[in-house]
């Protein structure tokens, strides 16, 4: 289990991690599609031209740019390098939960499922519901019209099957009276 050096301002850490997830999703998608070196992809996604004013996420839907402030860079790096390092394990965990072969999934959905699976299995410092909610939000933003439902269902099943998450999920269930 790894940790992150997130900003300490209330709410800032969550936003910084959300930005890290979004940037990691785009970088992992690029890696899946091109096979480009992860180090080169990381440098490309973190590079900002100081002469160019930052573009807010969403202004350029194909390649949003991020200012250095407000991005949990260690978390971005952990996601970007953690997913490929455990790719076979993640794919084996996901495959039985899918309604079709992993290789036939939309590349963005595949990247998002792998990202969520890695976080669920490696980042016990982040609640399971937060991880799934963030993945659903990214699917709504970047995925096909109904992909958020698919992402939600698969990651929910995965979380419930992970022994490391069992105590957290059971406590959550009791809190909600289910």
From Swiss-Prot:
Keyword Transferase: no
Gene Ontology CC annotations of this record: cytosol
Matches recorded under Pfam families: NusB
Signal peptide: none
Keywords: RNA-binding, Transcription, Transcription antitermination, Transcription regulation
InterPro entries reported in the protein's UniProt record: NusB-like_sf, NusB_fam, NusB_RsmB_TIM44
GO terms (BP aspect): DNA-templated transcription termination; transcription antitermination
GO molecular function terms attached to this record: RNA binding
Family of the protein in this entry: Belongs to the NusB family.
Function of the protein: Involved in transcription antitermination. Required for transcription of ribosomal RNA (rRNA) genes. Binds specifically to the boxA antiterminator sequence of the ribosomal RNA (rrn) operons.
HAMAP family with a match to the protein in the record: NusB (MF_00073)
Protein name per the record: Transcription antitermination protein NusB
Source organism: Alkalilimnicola ehrlichii (strain ATCC BAA-1101 / DSM 17681 / MLHE-1)
Organism phylogeny: Bacteria, Pseudomonadati, Pseudomonadota, Gammaproteobacteria, Chromatiales
